[in-house]
Structures are given as structure tokens and as C-alpha cells.
Amino acid sequence: MQGFFWKTWLVLAVCGTPASLAHRPLSYGEALELAVSVYNGKAGEASLYRLLEAVPQPEWDPSSEGSQQLNFTLKETACQVEEERSLEECGFQEDGVVLECTGYYFFGETPPVVVLSCVPVGGVEEEEEEEEEEQKAEAENDEEVEKEKEDEEKDQPKRVKRFKKFFKKVKKSVKKRLKKIFKKPMVIGVTFPF
């Protein structure tokens, strides 16, 4: 008798639970608002960012169970994060940073997941050009410095020269890697309840 009670209770529990917990439909506008809110809350920036432009997504399906993508542009505002003001009250900074962002919503996950990837506009191409210019300038500067140091170092032992050369390479390598680390795109991933 006791086994029958537990089997019945288990069947009722399974029947009473929805087969899949469907998410609340999310319109394209709501998805953009949520993406901007997530960026402002998780990016760790001092200033708030506001939507500058959104690429229309005619294939956006608010009731989709799969993944959805949206593309948009954010711009830095004059408001600071700690002020906790509404974005509508915040005007854009004249020279504010502009970010190209791509958001991916994964509605098939429980809870749903959003992943944002943002990079400064013109960042990649300009960074490459800046790097090339810096390398040229460094090479020219290095040649001049080397000529001056050669005159001074004629009397120094070879060991000292080798160490200086080695540490110069290490210094350049560290600088280059630090620049790359700090210029990588920002990627944020969060789950959100419906």
C-alpha cells in the first residue's frame, strides 16, 4: 500500500510540472533595453552608456526557443554609474567612446543567457595602424639610441651588452602584450530570470 501511495504521488508531481518552462516572450526593443542594462551593470565602466543605434532585426522571433542575435551601437554618456540616473536623463558626451556591440540571447537555456561583445568603433583598424607607426618610431629611436650607446659601451664587457640587449627585448615584449590585453573587446555573459 505504501508503494502505491509514493507511485501515485510521483505521477501527480510529474504531471503537475510543466514539460518545459517557457520563457516570457522578449520583443526586440526589450532585448535591446536588457542588453544596454546588462552592459552598464556588468562592464565596470565609470560612465553609463546609452543606445546610439540599433540594426533592425526583421527575423527576430520573440517566442523563439533557440538563440537570437542583435547588433547595436552604444555611446558614452555624461552620467556616472554611481549616480543611478535614468538613461533618458543622460546626454551623450561630445567625445564619448562609441562601442559596436553584438548580443546573443540563448533562450533554450534555463535560465536564459545573454552574451555581449563590445569593441570600440575604429578600434581594430586604428590600433593596427597605431601599432605600425609605433614600431617604426621605436625602430628609428632604437637606432639612434644604439649608436649613442655603442659609443659609450665600447669599454664595457660583452656580458653587460648582452644583458642590456636581452632586457630591452623583454621590456618591448611586455609593453606589447600589455597593450593587447587592455585593447581586447569586452565580453559579458549573464543569465536573466523571466
From Swiss-Prot:
Keyword annotations of the record: Antibiotic, Antimicrobial, Cleavage on pair of basic residues, Disulfide bond, Membrane, Secreted, Signal, Target cell membrane, Target membrane
InterPro entries: Cathelicidin-like, Cystatin_sf
Signal peptide span: 1-22
Disulphides: 79-90, 101-118
Any one GO BP annotation for this protein: defense response to bacterium
Compartments it resides in: Secreted; Target cell membrane
GO-annotated cellular components: extracellular space; membrane; other organism cell membrane
Residues covered by region (Disordered): 125-157
Listed Acidic residues bias regions: 125-154
Main location: secreted
Tissue: Expressed by the venom gland.
Propeptide segments, given as residue ranges: 23-160
Function summary: Potent antimicrobial peptide against Gram-negative and Gram-positive bacteria. Adopts an amphipathic alpha helical conformation, that may allow to partition into the target membrane. Low hemolytic activities have been observed on mammalian cells.
Additional comment: The putative mature sequence has been predicted by AMPA, a predictive algorithm for identification of peptide stretches with antimicrobial properties.
Record PANTHER family: CATHELICIDIN, NEUTROPHILIC GRANULE PROTEIN
Family membership noted in the UniProt record: Belongs to the cathelicidin family.
Record protein name field: Lachesicidin
Source species of the chain: Lachesis muta rhombeata (Bushmaster)
